[in-house]
Regions:
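Anaerobic metallocofactor- and corrinoid-dependent redox/one-carbon enzyme cores
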Residues: 1-60, 67-73, 77-275
Length: 275
């Protein structure tokens, strides 16, 4: 069976650019077929109204919607539309989504909340395209190397397995620091500690950017606030890299590729095949 997955990207968080790639890292997985639609950087209700219905054309076995802040007007409208569609749907969002878990339960939606996927410092005085790309590259590094992306991979792979068995169970997952580093399976305690610190820092970045973007009006105050958040995520990325380097030195990096039939396999010894 080939499981058909529809992915809707509206706006951007650090998980968005790699979401579909996490499911098929070598573009040779035989048991899934993915279609992605999106609205670019914007996620207003008018873009949502246009984009979300398009996924119905694919006749997907399940749909994943990813955006910042599932409680914002656009993503809230997307949740309404998806709850009315006759297809299982999963919402992936950042920390503000924690406050909408009950609503998503009532709407019959699954969810994955990536708590360490921080909002960007969206002030014009700081954020040009280069700064935007640099920030997102740091976030991607943190989420990849701390184990957060593996939680996303494992969760969606579980949904795929459910679809193959004819019994999809929608996930209810919040990716905390503990859940992320557990998935990374660090064997060196110092590596684990560095990864924990990196993920905690990423969560703090969201708090700082919230203050700089929405709670501070004076330009001479909000510019250094959002700039400091970007400096913090840069340091978090360096810590995450250090964690992985410690695991490399011990030849204990856990890898979980997809096998020839689409199943998840694993290995730690670099020179051995995954099983």
């Amino acid at each position: 069976m080939v499981v058909k997955i529809g992915i809707i990207k509206c706006g951007n968080i650090g998980t968005s650019p790699v979401l579909d790639l996490l499911l098929d890292e070598r573009a040779d997985r035989p048991n899934i077929d993915v279609r992605t639609v999106g609205s670019g950087a914007k996620m207003n209700p008018e873009q949502i109204e246009d984009v979300v219905p398009r996924v119905a054309d694919f006749d997907a076995d399940f749909v994943v919607f990813i955006s910042p802040n599932p409680g914002a007007p656009g993503p809230a409208r997307a949740r309404e539309l998806l709850s009315e569609m006759d297809v299982p749907a999963i919402i992936i969002g950042d920390a503000p989504g924690m406050g909408k878990k009950d609503e998503m339960d009532e709407q019959g939606l699954g969810y994955i909340i990536v708590q360490g996927d921080p909002m960007i410092g969206a002030r014009r005085e700081l954020l040009d395209p280069t700064e935007m790309a640099s920030f997102n590259s740091d976030v991607i590094k943190v989420l990849a190397l701390t184990g957060a992306y593996r939680v996303v991979q494992q969760t969606l792979d579980g949904v795929i397995a459910g679809a193959e068995a004819g019994n999809i169970e929608l996930p209810k997952v919040a990716i905390t620091t503990a859940k992320a580093v557990e998935a990374a399976a660090f064997q060196n305690p110092y590596a684990k500690a560095k990864a924990m610190a990196a993920y905690e820092m990423a969560m703090k970045v969201a708090d700082i950017d919230l203050k700089g973007c929405f709670m501070t009006k004076e330009m001479d105050k909000y510019i250094p606030i959002v700039a400091s958040a970007h400096e913090l995520i840069s340091v978090a990325a360096k810590l995450a890299i250090e964690a992985r380097e410690l695991e490399k030195a011990n030849n204990t990096v856990l890898r979980t590729p997809h096998g020839g039939q689409g199943q998840t396999v694993s290995k730690t010894d670099l020179m051995k095949k995954p099983e």
